[in-house]
Design a protein with these regions (language model features):
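Bacterial N-terminal signal peptides
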Residues: 8-21
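Conserved short hydrophobic patches within well-ordered secondary structure
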Residues: 7, 109-112, 164
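Positively charged n-region of N-terminal signal peptides that target proteins for export
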Residues: 1-4
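Primarily secretory-pathway and cell-envelope proteins
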Residues: 26-83, 131-174
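Amphipathic, positively biased hydrophobic alpha-helical segments used for protein targeting
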Residues: 19-22, 113, 144
Length: 174
């Protein structure tokens, strides 16, 4: 009888401790700068048989709470076919599963395309391609008309949440 009583008390104590334990933190995103940025920066990106240069000034590296990186960069497609220029705006390298807007993206390297609406104030489409050029995912972007100084590529982090901006168009990164 004592064994059963002590087992019940022990089970209750474990249940109380588990209930009081803090919940797992949401994925906190931070921007990477300095030497860590330089180490993660990729000079050329391979897509559809081409090594396309990236733009360092238009590159963002984010780091999650798990220490895994997400690298976003615009591509310099001048000198490439009009098909490549129209299809790809940038690239993404992810070291873990991530949500880019509503699109789930697995670990790997991808090309990014942006299809802007007419008129320009509406939501655009961000398209994710594998390195062979096949469409992997698509998500809608938001348009931020109030953005004071839009730049070609930037990321903001507020309260651990990240937004990726391509000009005035943005998606949340998780």
């Amino acid at each position: 009888m004592k064994k059963v009583l002590w087992s019940g008390v022990l089970a209750l104590a474990v249940a109380v401790l588990l209930a009081l334990a803090p919940a797992p933190a949401q994925a906190q995103m931070t921007k990477v700068e300095g030497k860590a940025f330089d180490s993660a920066y990729v000079r050329d990106f391979y897509l559809e048989g081409n090594a396309i240069p990236t733009q360092k000034r238009n590159t963002v590296v984010l780091k999650g709470a798990d220490g895994k990186h997400l690298v976003f960069s615009l591509l310099d497609t001048s000198g490439y076919s009009s098909e490549i220029q129209q299809k790809y705006a940038g690239m993404i390298i992810v070291e873990r599963k991530a949500m880019v807007g509503a699109a789930a993206v697995g670990t790997g390297a991808y090309g990014l395309g942006l299809v802007k609406p007419t008129p320009a104030e509406g939501p655009a489409k961000l398209i994710v391609y594998d390195v062979a050029g096949a469409k992997v995912a698509e998500t809608a972007t938001q348009h931020d008309a109030k953005l004071a100084q839009p730049v070609p590529l930037q990321a903001t982090t507020t309260g651990g949440q990240a937004k990726l901006y391509l000009g005035r168009y943005w998606v949340e990164i998780k």
